[in-house]
Amino acid sequence: MGILGLSKLLYDKSPNAIREQELKNFFGRRIAVDASMSIYQFIIAMKGFQDGQGLELTNEKGDVTSHLNGLFARTLRMIDEGIKPIYVFDGKPPKLKADELEMRRQKAAEAERAFEKAKDAGDDEMMEKMSKRTVRVSRDQIDESKKLLRLMGIPVIQAPSEAEAQCAELVKKGKAWAVGTEDMDALTFGSTVMLRHLNISDAKKRPIVEIHLDEVLQTTGLSMDQFVDLCILLGCDYVPKVPGIGPQKAWEGIQRYGSIESFLESLDTTKHPVPADFYYKEARAFFQNPEVTRAEEIDIQFSEPDEVGLIQFLVKEKLFNPDRVNKGIARLRAAFTRKTQGRLDSFFTITKVPQQTAAARAPLVGTKRPRDGKYVHVSGTLRKATSGHKKAVKK
């Protein structure tokens, strides 16, 4: 879930902290990528629907390969642009997330029932919508994704808990420049730079959204502690929302009272009853001090691709097109042997112009709003681009 409504709120309150970029603009950058989120996106993007049945991208043996196809293609695309991705995988979820995970399971079960109901009614549009809501990333898909990345020579990090928190740790300690994820809580965990839409296909022509935490804090006048409290009030994975407290009330509450404690004291509890399990102090502590492996203990190494291993895994086991795999290996080798060309901004000290706080700045007219974050079905182009694979009815 991330942080509910935070993206739109930042566009409203701190638009200067947000930039739209092209992939090529991140040349030379190390980016810590939320691997589980990326794999989920690839599966959703390649999930089709036809004749009342959900379709998966499979090979000739019937093995689902959408996660490997997407990961292989997008990683190569980043490598081509001189980007150095570091994939971070989720570990054990914190106890605070138990209720959220149970709610997700219930929603998936509801989607299954809604799918069957729509099927009986012959509602293809509703069936396709519900089919995508039942998608889950399996343990086998995670393990295969790790294997592929290691064979490609791309660093893989196993987080002890939340991947976004581990990614933020790498950024805060200078091991990576930004976190690549759709979950806005990467900022709440303290990542100084966050990138959204990093894994969306170039064919959609959707820009990558770059958000700078320091500029958010400077423009809004919030401290980091207050920003964390704001995110908790907006709605996060670890505590329920306070009824009737939307983005604007949460924003005004933190601006006026400075903390969740003082804000709750001001509330009319008959209108806004605080849930008994609103353990905001525990959520705050987790955001401020999450379970991570210290960046200093992580050795990040990019290595040459394992050509024999890639051919064995992708071509012989997963039945990928040999020509496609060989071309991918050539691109990986070229990137590994390419002489490092530094970014211009590494040679200069760049001084940022101070920005006004929210109170001092006049309202901005015509501020750009974020685009819809829905995933668009593009199975047709993907089918064409992945020779040797086909759409098959999900068993």
UniProtKB/Swiss-Prot annotation:
PROSITE patterns reported in the protein's UniProt record: XPG_1 (PS00841), XPG_2 (PS00842)
One Gene Ontology biological process: base-excision repair
Localization in the cell: Nucleus, Nucleolus; Nucleus, Nucleoplasm; Mitochondrion
Residue sites binding DNA per the record: 74, 162, 235, 237
Cofactor(s) this protein cannot do without: Mg(2+)
Role: Structure-specific nuclease with 5'-flap endonuclease and 5'-3' exonuclease activities involved in DNA replication and repair. During DNA replication, cleaves the 5'-overhanging flap structure that is generated by displacement synthesis when DNA polymerase encounters the 5'-end of a downstream Okazaki fragment. It enters the flap from the 5'-end and then tracks to cleave the flap base, leaving a nick for ligation. Also involved in the long patch base excision repair (LP-BER) pathway, by cleaving within the apurinic/apyrimidinic (AP) site-terminated flap.
Post-translational modification: Phosphorylated. Phosphorylation upon DNA damage induces relocalization to the nuclear plasma.
Organism: Leishmania major
CDD domains: H3TH_FEN1-Euk, PIN_FEN1
Claim: Repressor is one of the keywords in the record: no
Protein name: Flap endonuclease 1
